[in-house]
Amino acid sequence: FCLSRGLGDVYKRQGVPLGILATGTACVYSRNLGLPRGLAGAALAMTGVPRSMDLGWASLDGGSPEPFLVATGMGRDAETLLGVRNNLKKRLGWVAYVRAGLGTMGRHRLPLRINGQPIEAWTVLAGNVGRVPTASLFPGARPDDGRLHVMHLGVDGWRDWWPVLLTGMTHSRRDIGKLLRWETAHVLIGSDIPRAVHLDGDLRTAARSLEVWIDPGALLIRCRGSIN
């Protein structure tokens, strides 16, 4: 079950606090909130302090908006998901994504657009939070900062990856030539032909456009008094 799929109903009942248990997509998101796992996490999901958190929205080819918690993107990162088998995902968790990613990291950049401007990118990501397992995509990003965090990853082959991986693993905020990040309220990612798109790690139908924005404070989530 992907947590983001159930957020539409929660969003319609604004004002009702949401408790999160750390499994699947919720596990990645809960780490950004500093939520514990196990019994402590279950107790916090029932009794934690309600705090306002942002919610991401994405529209593919002008279709109905879909909510997300962690990140969405167009390009090679979404293609990686084609190689993630469900049985491996259940058995290995996020390691299954890393394993599949090794098969796409060496592929060349794609012709894409950001807000109508032509670019070449391995992928373009838009995130609501900053951290994923083993790395920080958007250092300093918080789930309640009211901002959309965008990454243009312009690697083109294996050699370009090493400084990018080092930047992610050291949680560095410094951008490099192949890695550009910025904050905004809205971004439109486009392509002349349908490209792979993912939403919180779930592969979606290939699309020519991916419009993304943040709804600040849209969710009430039970947390600790402060976010780590």
Predicted regions and their residues:
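Short acidic/glycine-rich loop or secondary-structure boundary segments that cap or lie
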Residues: 77-80, 120, 131-135, 158-161
